[in-house]
Amino acid sequence: MALRAAQSAKAGVRAARPNRATAVVCKAQKVGQAAAAAALATAMVAGSANALTFDEIQGLTYLQVKGSGIANTCPVLESGTTNLKELKAGSYKLENFCIEPTSFTVKEESQFKGGETEFVKTKLMTRLTYTLDAMSGSFKVGSDGSAELKEDDGIDYAATTVQLPGGERVAFLFTIKQFDGKGTLDGIKGDFLVPSYRGSSFLDPKGRGGSTGYDNAVALPARADAEELLKENVKITKALKGSAVFSVAKVDPVTGEIAGVFESIQPSDTDLGAKPPKDIKVTGLWYAQLK
């Protein structure tokens, strides 16, 4: 019975999600994010089966959610308006902040001589565990149309791996940790921290770590300070920085729900400082509740 109910719930929203995708994409195009909108359109329509509202998700049992992919999606905002002026000026508490990626691209050098670097499409290798959820923070709206968004706490990072067309796999910690952005409701821009993909206690295959393990490769103690080996011996866990822009597409003044699209660029894993990071561009949807 639980499985049948879950299937019915998913089937009931298949017609609703494409409408939501169209509305969000049109809004993104309006604010000059045509490239992100094109990627979002394809991804959202293709993955529309599990879209549910916040109340519908809260009403599901564990067995209905298990194995369905619903846990990796953000709630749908079906009611409300695209007229952002309906959102009254003031300071709000941001709750149930959710970010659902729909596209991952990696900046790569051109294969042609003299070509420019560009973001290339990737194949997602991670299971459905990359959505950020249950985050909290603050949201401010000014009478002049200005807006501020800050993220404070929650499930704000997720280990993710993608594969490039050539087969190379790129690991990164998808996050918007401590995001602090300002702008307008059409585009709230800011920076965030990107913690190290691995912690200081992680040991590499030769037993070297940041806070534990060997100081150098045990077979080469005399060459521990050699330049070509130093970056492998000295482990760096310093947090890096990323940037993101959030665009509000729809608000519901009655329930306090808000939703839109986002785009972020962040560095990939550096193997504890042993290799330079790659730029990862993530686009997708976001949802939150204003209190």
Curated annotation (Swiss-Prot):
InterPro entries according to UniProt: OMP/PagP_b-brl, PsbO
Function of the molecule: Stabilizes the manganese cluster which is the primary site of water splitting.
PANTHER family (alphabetical): OXYGEN-EVOLVING ENHANCER PROTEIN 1-2, CHLOROPLASTIC
Question: What is a single Pfam family found in this protein's UniProt entry?
Answer: MSP
Transit peptide range is: 1-52
According to the UniProt record, one GO cellular component term is: chloroplast thylakoid membrane
Superkingdom of this entry's organism? Eukaryota
Family statement: Belongs to the PsbO family.
Subcellular location(s) of the protein: Plastid, Chloroplast thylakoid membrane
Molecular-function GO term, any one: oxygen evolving activity
The record's Gene Ontology biological-process terms are:
photosystem II assembly; photosystem II stabilization
Gene this protein is translated from: PSBO
Q: Which SUPFAM superfamilies match?
A: OMPA-like
- Print the keywords alphabetically: Chloroplast, Manganese, Membrane, Photosynthesis, Photosystem II, Plastid, Thylakoid, Transit peptide
What's this protein's name?
Answer: Oxygen-evolving enhancer protein 1, chloroplastic
